[in-house]
Amino acid sequence: CWFIQRIGKKFASKDDVVDSRKILNKWKFLVPIAPIAGQTDFSKPIGFYYDGNTIVAKPGECSTESWLVAGTFDTEKEVKNFKSYLFTKISRFLLLQAVISQHVTRKNFMFVPDLGRYDKKITDDYLIKKFEISKSDWEYIDSRITKIKDE
C-alpha cells in the first residue's frame, strides 16, 4: 500500500483494504492530493505533477487517502500513456483553472477531458492539434506551467 510520500510503500493486510470500486487489480496512476504544497506565488509558473511526486501503482497495490487515483487501466502501457497526458502543460493548465488551494480533488479535474483511449503517448503537440489551440493561447499556457522532464 502506498502511504504518504515520506513513508512510501509498506505492507497492508488484505483485510484492511476496502476495494468498493473494484480497482485493486488494475494499473493505477496515483497523484498527491497536495501537489503544490508551499507554493504561494502563483505569478510564477506552476508544476503540479512530475515523476518525483506521482506513482504508477501495479495491480494489487493500494494507496491511502494521501493519494488521488487519477486513472485506472488494464495495462501498463495505458497507465504510462495516461501519465504522459497528465504531464502535458495543457492538461496541467486545465487543472489549474479549478484549483483554489493546495488540495486537489477529483472535482478539480473538471476541465481536463478524458481522452477515452490511451493507446499512445500523449504530447502537447498532439493536444494543440486535437483541440485546435491557437499560437497565442499556447504561448500563454506555456508561460504559466513549468516544464517537466517527461514532456
What is each PLM-predicted segment?
Residues 1-122, 126-132, 137, 143-151:
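Polybasic, glycine- and aromatic-enriched phosphate-binding surface used to engage nucleic acids
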